[in-house]
């Protein structure tokens, strides 16, 4: 018995065509290889009231072949875009590792409620990976003390040390009776610290050759070497001790080694206890004092009594943790300047951050990876809600086409001169900036030139990307796109980024979803992708809120 013929667009043939088209789309989106991913998504799966915060699941996974900093920043709309916190805003996300699922904070700073059918529910982000090369750092550097007026100003308290020469360092053992002095410090959990200093003769240690010290053992767990110095004559080593408990010991035994390191990056003081060393590159920053962010007190400044000195060989960048409802300053840290980070509440509920809770990571990048944008005085850091990234031609960046990145006050309209400048710049720069083509003309057109092996085989895709990267480095095309982080006043070459392997979940695809490829596949655009809203997880309860057992709410805590 023969089957009845079905009309075009109906019946089993049309269903099979739709299924095959969906499978083809899923396969194209399933394995992408690029240097930078541009993701244009439509917010669905719920509503977002004005002035509220929710988590946005972009339904996209990114992977790299080596440990890197995986970043996801909101894309600049134009070269002269400002931080206009009057619309949908995505908080910058930074994760250290080899894979990440893009889940970001979404704030609605606009005056209207966001619904799935609203017009302004489209956001664009850029995802990229920053390489982490091995950078040796001296934790306790032997600084030469400045002139203090003579031998009489040397610390009066001295200690006798036992010094022994080993294969690669000098081992020092000594016992000292510290003369403790109490010093108040509001940035610490205890609010105080006990300090002491003493000196011992270097003996056979050549102070003109050694430059680092490592503490191996101490008789008291709360006592540590904070700083070390040598005198101008090269005869004495001075140690500065810190003790962070209410009762310092009367006698301290120390065992440490003195050696030659010649590190390009050194810490001004001992990183312990608020900077935890990472294996190959950088430190994890721990909160020195617990605090609570509320709607009455939405800001807090974290201070770390330490700094780094790179001798202009590296850039020091701080990447904050992803704490829902909290925005932390991120970006370059200047040399020899105390670390200060502003933490701001962006959600609706109070957030409590504990003592020694990880706040972020500090990593080092060799000088030349980040280039200061022409016309900018210096690299700066910005809160996570103000992190932006853009792709612009190198020639435009070098001639100063990317303007000063300044925050704009919410609710203030731009001046006539700013509007005219933006219109002129848009006409000049939009032609050179790759933008997605219309949906009807670009349906899955971005992969017509790509082979099936490239999409299915990760190694083949990465090899092709590396070959193209080498070709562009040799050619030196000034019209090539660069990754600009206007929030930090820096830009970087796409060739220096770590290649990404991207997979978009099948549930995020829509009939109008499409792909686009630019810069020989270095920039991949996945547009018209569906993303969903999630509720913000309940924050950690603060001691103020847990201490009260009354069911009656209070406007402020009782003092």
Swiss-Prot record:
Residues 431-440, 543-559 have a biased composition (Low complexity). Keywords: Activator, G1/S host cell cycle checkpoint dysregulation by virus, Host endoplasmic reticulum, Host nucleus, Host-virus interaction, Modulation of host cell cycle by virus, Phosphoprotein, S-nitrosylation, Virion, Virion tegument. It is found in: Virion tegument; Host nucleus; Host endoplasmic reticulum. GO terms for cellular component: host cell endoplasmic reticulum; host cell nucleus; viral tegument. GO terms for biological process: DNA-templated viral transcription; symbiont-mediated perturbation of host cell cycle G1/S transition checkpoint. The keyword Phosphoprotein applies. Residues 404-440, 530-559 are annotated as: Disordered. Its main location: virion. S-nitrosylation limits ability to undermine the cGAS/STING antiviral pathway. InterPro entries: Herpes_UL82/UL83. Residues 415-430 have a biased composition (Acidic residues). Stimulates viral immediate-early (IE) transcription. Plays a role in the inhibition of the host innate repsonse by targeting STING1 and thus the cGAS-STING pathway. Also counteracts host DAXX-mediated repression of viral transcription. Displaces a DAXX-binding protein, ATRX, from nuclear domain 10 sites (ND10) shortly after infection. Increases the basal level of SUMOylated DAXX in infected cells. Stimulates quiescent cells to re-enter the cell cycle, proceed through G1 and enter the S phase. Belongs to the herpesviridae pp71 family. Interacts with the host protein DAXX; this interaction takes place at ND10 and induces the reversal of DAXX-mediated repression of viral transcription. Interacts with UL35. Interacts with host TMEM173/STING1; this interaction inhibits the cGAS/STING pathway. Interacts with host RB1; this interaction mediates RB1 proteasomal degradation. This is Protein pp71. It comes from Human cytomegalovirus (strain Merlin) (HHV-5).
């Amino acid at each position: 018995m023969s089957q009845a013929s079905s009309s075009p667009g109906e019946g089993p043939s049309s269903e099979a065509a739709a299924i095959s088209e969906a499978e083809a789309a899923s396969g194209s989106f399933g394995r992408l290889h690029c240097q930078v991913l541009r993701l244009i998504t439509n917010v669905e799966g719920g509503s977002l009231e004005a002035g509220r915060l929710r988590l946005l699941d972009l339904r996209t996974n990114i992977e790299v072949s080596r440990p890197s900093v995986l970043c996801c920043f909101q894309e600049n709309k134009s070269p002269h875009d400002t931080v206009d916190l009057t619309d949908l805003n995505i908080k910058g996300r930074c994760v250290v590792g080899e894979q990440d699922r893009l889940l970001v904070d979404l704030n609605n700073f606009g005056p209207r409620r966001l619904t799935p059918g609203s017009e302004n529910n489209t956001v664009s982000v850029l995802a990229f990976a920053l390489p982490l090369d091995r950078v040796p750092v001296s934790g306790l550097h032997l600084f030469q003390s400045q002139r203090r007026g003579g031998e009489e100003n040397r610390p009066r308290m001295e200690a006798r040390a036992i010094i022994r020469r080993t294969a690669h360092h000098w081992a020092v053992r000594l016992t000292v009776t510290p003369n403790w002095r109490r010093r108040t410090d509001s940035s610490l959990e205890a609010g105080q610290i006990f300090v002491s200093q003493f000196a011992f003769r270097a003996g056979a240690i050549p102070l003109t050759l050694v430059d680092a010290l490592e503490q191996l053992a101490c008789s008291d767990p709360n006592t540590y070497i904070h700083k070390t110095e040598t005198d101008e004559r090269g005869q004495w080593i001075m140690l500065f001790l810190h003790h962070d408990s209410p009762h310092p010991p009367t006698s301290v035994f120390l065992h440490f080694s003195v050696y030659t390191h010649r590190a390009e990056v050194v810490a001004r003081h001992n990183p312990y206890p608020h900077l935890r060393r990472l294996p190959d590159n950088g430190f994890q920053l721990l909160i020195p004092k617990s605090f609570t962010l509320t709607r009455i007190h939405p800001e807090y400044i974290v201070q770390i009594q330490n700094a780094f000195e790179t001798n202009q060989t590296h850039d020091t960048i701080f990447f904050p943790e992803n704490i829902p409802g909290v925005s932390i300053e991120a970006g370059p840290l200047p040399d020899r300047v105390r670390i200060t980070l502003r933490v701001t509440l962006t959600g609706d509920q109070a957030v409590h951050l504990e003592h020694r809770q990880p706040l972020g990571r500090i990593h080092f990048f060799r000088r030349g990876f980040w280039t200061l944008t022409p016309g900018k005085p210096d690299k700066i850091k910005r809160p996570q809600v103000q992190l932006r990234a853009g792709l612009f031609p190198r020639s435009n960046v070098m001639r100063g086409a990317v303007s000063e990145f300044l925050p704009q006050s919410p609710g203030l309209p731009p001046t006539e001169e700013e509007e005219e400048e933006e219109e002129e710049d848009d006409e000049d720069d939009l032609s050179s900036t790759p933008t997605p083509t219309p949906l009807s003309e670009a349906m899955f057109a971005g992969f017509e030139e790509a082979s099936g092996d490239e999409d299915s085989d990760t190694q083949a895709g990465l090899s092709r990307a590396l070959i193209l990267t080498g070709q562009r480095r040799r050619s030196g095309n000034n019209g090539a796109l660069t990754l600009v982080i206007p929030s930090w006043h820096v830009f970087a070459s796409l060739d220096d980024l770590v290649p990404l392997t991207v997979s978009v979940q099948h549930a995020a695809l829509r009939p109008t979803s499409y792909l686009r490829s630019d810069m020989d596949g270095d920039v991949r655009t996945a547009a018209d992708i569906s993303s969903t809203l999630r509720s913000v997880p309940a924050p950690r309860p603060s001691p103020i809120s847990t201490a009260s057992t009354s069911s009656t709410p209070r406007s402020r805590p009782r003092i």
